[in-house]
Amino acid sequence: MANRSSKQFFIISAIFGLSGCLAGCSVTKFLPENEYLLNKVKLESEDKSLDLSAYEPYIRQKGNTKWFSSFRIPLATYSLAGKDSTKWINKTLKNIGEKPAILDTTLTHSTRTDLQTALQNAGYLDATVDTKANIVKKRKVNITYILKPGPLYHINNVAYDIKDDSIAAKMEHIYPKRMWLKKGMPFNVGQLDAERKRITSVLTDNGYFHFHKDFISFTADSVKGEKLVNIALHLDKFRPANSTCDTLHTSYTIGSVNFTGGNNGKLPLRKGTLAENTWIEEGKPFCSTDLKRTYNSFGKLQAIRYTNIQFT
């Protein structure tokens, strides 16, 4: 037990010793003139209730990878290489190491823009983002993005502009209980897209085979002097391919349901077994959920290697 502990202590000591040596290497020797190594990137917010972790994915450039939360071993390994790229040792060190994260001001600007857009999409319509660059020793720089979200806007009213009368009548009957957007809730662009998907799901489950969410759009207008937004949902008519005329969306009903085999035409299972695993039923409106369930059911049958459901 004592020998094992001594061995573990030696390994750990060697690792930290190597880390110290590598950390002492000049990591700025490959930097072009007037360039800076991106040392650290930080997010701050004037609103302390803001979840900063939700905005970290918008950071386009970060510093080099750290090991043990302290040492940039991959960067230091890269820095051990000489400038003669023809030598194998230099090539090897560069391949296993990590290139210096040279500050790219274009990416910094893009990050600031993306962060501001993300805040506005989350309902902070007056949001701005500032950047602060702090140059530290040895040509290194720390970048801080300061989020200034401002007040959160809320929905004042939701209006529906449905240009297809048949869909308007059907939605009035089947959709009101499923409506998500309501007066008083925080404005959020993500929720608008979720509403498009919900309406699309309702319609494709009720016969509208060709309907997709691109038929739905939104307009949002802020109320002057208030932190409120009026929302209008627009649902357009159907436009056939290669046509300039709009028509009503067609609702389809399932006719007959038939089964065919593969190349030899032979069914892998009895028709009764296939019918038991088929959610699509004759005489019912087309339903995208039933289509997915049928694919899932057939996928669990070992005798069936491939399923292709076609509508004609």
Which role does the model predict for each range below?
Residues 2, 26-301, 306:
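Interaction-mediating elements
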Residues 2-11:
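Bacterial N-terminal signal peptides that target proteins for export
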Residues 10-19:
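Gram-negative bacterial Sec-dependent N-terminal signal peptides
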Residues 20-24:
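C-terminal motif of bacterial Sec signal peptides marking the signal peptidase cleavage site
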Residues 310-311:
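Gly/Pro-rich turn-and-neighbor structural signature
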